[in-house]
Regions:
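Membrane-interface helix-loop junctions and terminal tails of multi-pass membrane proteins
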Residues: 1-176
Length: 176
């Protein structure tokens, strides 16, 4: 069980260090928002594929919604789900803080970007539903590539850039 907990924490930390770090790098390298989003998308797609592949034999939810669905499907217990969610949120916050730090920002740098509105909420519902659909309908052998591809696409077809992850939403509030 410890390896599953370690996988959830470390995998979520690396995922959100990648998401935020690649966004910061993209902004540092270009004032073109499209190029920044493209860089952010590519880094996230590669990281997701890598993380799901290496941690998949242990646990690779990295997302409280995915863990809750696995609880409903009776694939994990309530206790395991609760610990996963705590570790996922903690990992996301740590990953964001590390990204801030390695780019010489204050580790805790609260977001100033307004991220509110019904359109963003609906965008996140759509992104999360699509993610769950991909996870539940993909074969185990293909889940890494299908999740990575879907999230890469969802960065571009959702107005929210597809957080699709409550741990990430909390973690990203620690960065602009």
């Amino acid at each position: 069980m410890k390896s599953k907990y370690f996988s959830e924490f470390l995998g979520t930390a690396f995922l959100f260090c990648t998401v935020v770090g690649s966004g910061i790098m993209g902004q540092n390298l270009s004032s073109n928002d499209s190029l920044t989003l493209l860089a952010n998308t590519l880094a996230t797609v590669f990281a997701l594929y890598f993380l799901i592949t290496i941690f998949g034999d242990h646990s690779s939810h990295f997302n409280p919604v995915v863990s809750m669905v696995m609880l409903v499907r009776k694939e994990i217990s309530t206790q395991v789900c609760t610990v996963f969610i705590i570790l996922q949120i903690s990992g996301a916050i740590l990953g964001v803080m590390l990204a801030n730090y390695i780019f010489e920002l204050d580790p805790v740098y609260f977001s100033e970007k307004p991220r509110s509105g019904t359109h963003l909420f609906v965008s996140e519902i759509l992104a999360t539903f699509g993610l769950l659909m991909v996870i539940l309908l993909s074969s185990k052998e293909k889940v890494a590539v299908t999740v990575a591809a879907y999230i890469g696409a969802a960065y571009w077809f959702t107005s929210s850039t597809s957080f699709a992850n409550p741990a990430g939403t909390i973690g990203r509030s620690f960065s602009n």
